[in-house]
Curated annotation (Swiss-Prot):
Protein species of origin: Adiantum capillus-veneris
Protein name, entry field: NAD(P)H-quinone oxidoreductase subunit H, chloroplastic
Compartments, record wording: Plastid, Chloroplast thylakoid membrane
The entry's keywords: Chloroplast, Membrane, NAD, NADP, Plastid, Plastoquinone, Quinone, Thylakoid, Translocase, Transport
Major site of localization recorded for this protein: plastid
Family listed: Belongs to the complex I 49 kDa subunit family.
Its EC number(s): 7.1.1.-
Length: 394
């Protein structure tokens, strides 16, 4: 006696929230017919900490340690967008040296984030070895962060009007040495993985998103660029000093999991190119705008007197009044467009701070991609989107 697969009721399986391939506390409720996925529902909120509400009774300086807990693998980007918002709102100019230092830190953070995406993604689909390799390069990046900021993760390095401290003596040479070491390693990963027939069977044509779908779903970052859309906020919004550097947007046209992998590999190479240029062009001068701490106290330029000069070396005051305006600021994070919508009301606290996390928006398309695929493909699709639950649940 044989029963057709269509006659069997779907089996409902819960993947997560503590599944080894879930990339955090995400839960998928999956309806299966044999090995085929019939339906899928995402259950979020296991890591919700009320980050937007916390911001409403913290000054920007007090809130900076909180933002590193959104995307805790690329913390420089959350810091960058958090200080960029008040800077744009109050029209604070940052010194050129500070801008270059920020770009260097952001690109190092991008490489570290992509490396820690690459290892687990390959481990999920059966290639265990690169998972152990990527920690070599990531460790070197964290050593550079530790030398410059004092922290390996959760750096708390960016400030309104600049950065917290200048680069230490010898740091630039160390960073150039890292660039020289890292580039051949990225090519090594490509040789190990890209042409591997088992890897290609697992990723080619899996999780296909066409160009129009990617735009309609509001995707950003590698997920959008892998579908043939050349959209990178570093080119479009002209923030920091990216315009002064010579680099290209990395993109692919296929729109599948393989294309998303290739975009991230190419982005790591491009980040090293940006790093080398920024380190070479790094100007002298101050690393922080000390006028920034006198934000909105008077509309015209403040007269310096003898009393003020004794405080000239102090860091930006935590009581920066935000003008009664609203502003949306975004940066190109490793996972996509990370944005903040900030509303000031002439007080030291923001009236509202809305976070636009890339992972949360990119996660919307996952149920559509999974339907009709095999159970084993769920891990591939979810891994290729690259999500961090800290920023999804906030």
């Amino acid at each position: 006696m044989s029963i057709r697969l269509e006659d069997i009721d779907p089996v409902v399986v819960s993947m997560g929230p503590h599944h080894p391939s879930m990339h955090g506390v995400l839960r998928l409720v999956v309806a299966l017919q044999g090995e085929n996925v019939v339906d899928c529902e995402l259950i979020l909120g296991y890591l919700h900490r009320g980050m937007e509400k916390i911001a409403e009774n913290r000054t920007t300086s007090q809130y900076l340690p909180y933002v590193t807990r959104w995307d805790y693998l690329a913390t420089m980007f959350t810091e960058a967008v958090t200080v960029n918002a008040p800077e744009k709102l109050a029209n604070i100019q940052i010194p050129e040296r500070a801008s270059y230092i920020r770009v260097i830190m952001l690109e190092l953070s991008r490489i570290a984030s992509h490396l820690l995406w690459l290892g687990p993604f390959l481990a999920d689909i059966g290639a265990q070895t690169p998972f152990f390799y990527i920690f070599r390069e990531r460790e070197m990046i964290y050593d550079l962060f530790e030398a410059a900021t004092g922290m390996r993760m959760m750096h708390n390095y960016f400030r309104i009007g600049g950065v917290a401290a200048d680069l230490p003596y010898g740091w630039i040479d160390k960073c150039l040495d890292f660039c020289q070491y890292c580039l051949p390693k990225i090519y090594e990963y490509e040789r190990l993985v890209t042409k591997n027939p088992i890897f290609l069977k697992r990723v080619q044509g899996v999780g296909f998103i066409n160009r129009q779908e990617a735009i309609n779903w509001g995707l950003s970052g590698p997920s959008l660029r892998a579908s043939g859309v050349q959209w990178d906020l570093r080119k479009i919004d002209h923030y920091e000093c990216y315009d002064k550097l010579d680099w290209q947007i990395q993109w692919q046209g296929e729109g599948d999991s393989l294309a998303r992998y290739l975009v991230r590999i190419d982005e790591m190479k491009e980040s090293i190119n940006i790093l080398r240029q920024a380190l070479k062009l790094l100007p002298g001068g101050p690393y922080e705008n000390l006028e920034g701490r006198r934000l909105v106290q008077k509309k015209d330029k403040i007269d310096w007197n003898g009393f003020n000069y004794q405080f000239v070396g102090k860091k930006s005051s935590p009581t920066l009044k935000l003008p009664k305006q609203e502003h949306y600021v975004r940066v190109e994070a490793p996972k996509g467009e990370l944005g903040i919508f900030l509303i000031g009301d002439d007080s030291v606290f923001p009236w509202r701070l809305k976070i636009r996390p890339p992972g949360f928006i990119n996660l919307q398309i996952v149920p559509q991609l999974i339907r009709g695929m095999k159970l084993a493909d769920i891990v591939t699709i979810l891994g290729s989107i690259d999500i961090i639950m800290g920023e999804v649940d906030r």
